Amino acid sequence: MGRNTLGINCMSDTFDVIVVGAGLAGLVCATEAADAGKRVLVLDQEPEQSLGGQAFWSFGGLFFVDSPEQRRMGVKDSHALALTDWLGTAGFDRPEDHWPRRWAEAYVDFAASEKRRWLYDMGMRWFPVVGWAERGGHGSIGHGNSVPRFHVTWGTGPGVLEPFVRRAREAQARGKLQFGFRHRVDELIVERGAVVGVRGSLLAEDKVERGKPSSREISGAFELRAQAVVVASGGIGANHELVRKYWPERLGAPPAHMLCGVPAHVDGRMLDITEAAGAQLINRDRMWHYVE
């Protein structure tokens, strides 16, 4: 298969970890792995100027529980209240909801303990007034947050990304992390029941401005291997066909016109690719779309 734009041999070079997706989730995963001493490769179909994905366009609101900002405003919050709010919203009423519930419990634990300090130590700061997004009713008995928990980061989305982009560049300078932009993953390689690498298409170089659709012209192919492959790409907000396909039945027919609040590359294509490799995808009708 020759050589790709990374300047590495596509057939023989291996990495400890390949991360598919250079958005916020991918950057967090990649920097944590690199700081743990792993050799990491981050692949993304978009050009380098789109590093950070759709998080760049976000308002930068973060979920903290019983934070200094809340206490300063007189907001009385607690781990127990936050978990009750979360469970009241999510429901977790399907047989496949065991692991989603476990994840929710772990995330509330994180938000009520080390999350803020971890981000603060990386340089992140927050607006002193806590917002009340996803507002619930009276008391923690139904849908939404019963108290304000929406902590807006100074610098909004770019401010959330900055520490992780910085850490990624530092890891890159140490030789622990490598980026492969314009590398579109089309297949996860499965051998003996395990994912061992990725195959895909090299997309033509494109200097398009961040947020605008980039070219899908194919200029080559690649195959890369790793001990672990992490797919950190799952948003479907710009793929209205996919949104309509999995539109919740309880809401009736999907709307004929949809307002898109994310760039065109938020296409959800890695969902089917991951499922084809053996992943179990659940709750595809439970969507959350923010118009950033």
Predicted regions and their residues:
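Extreme N-terminal leader/targeting segments of oxidoreductases
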Residues: 1-17, 35
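N-terminal Rossmann-like FAD-binding beta1-loop-alpha1 element of flavoenzymes
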Residues: 17-42
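Glycine-rich, N-terminal phosphate-binding loop of Rossmann-like dinucleotide-binding domains
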Residues: 22, 66, 202, 233-234
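Generic hydrophobic/aromatic pocket-lining and core-packing "Φ" positions
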Residues: 27-30, 116, 271
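Glycine-rich FAD pyrophosphate-binding loop
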Residues: 35-56
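N-terminal glycine-rich dinucleotide-binding loop that anchors FAD/FMN and/or NAD(P) in oxidoreductases
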Residues: 56-86
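Conserved redox-cofactor binding core of oxidoreductases
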Residues: 104-222, 226, 239-243
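Glycine-rich loop(s) and the adjacent beta-strand/alpha-helix scaffold that form part
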Residues: 205-292
